[in-house]
Amino acid sequence: MNEQELCKKKLIDLSRQANRKGIVLFSDFLNLNELNIYHQNEKFFETKTEASGGVPFAERQIVAFIPDALYYEWQFPIAYLEIVPSYPKFAEKLGHRDILGSLMNLGVDRSKLGDIVICDDKYFLICEESMASYFIENLDKIRHTVVKLSPVTADALEQQQKFEEKDGIITSNRLDSMIACVYKFSRS
């Protein structure tokens, strides 16, 4: 059985379990390929579904399987952590791969991690609620920078995200043309 079939069966099984038990069940964080499989197979689910990555435009998302007879409030099991250098004066500039590498070095499965958001000199991690305390206790160094993690709210993270609207003329419906227009790069 290939990876796509396995993902499809896993999602359908979660839907059946949620329907049978009458409770909301959640997937792990799904990557873009798994989200594509989820969207292609929504017609096979026995429950309603909803996907969220914790912030708008999140790349990695959790899917909630919601039974029809649901009568209680629920929330996505998502935690938001801010990564702060303990000694800002001596801190290195960290990148996405530095943070992800340190998290993976803790032996954590990638499916427990959501997006890593970097805004200016602030770093945020979106993860499953069940893993937040583990990261707070065990992640103390990224590259050569000593760090501490602290929980924040989704609002604090959303305030850090900045979007910019760009106007321009795109000569063809190709990705390289769009990137050239937005970032003022030559296509060559």
Regions found by a protein language model. Name each.
Residues 1-185:
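Ferredoxin-like alpha/beta domains used as RNA- or RNAP-binding modules
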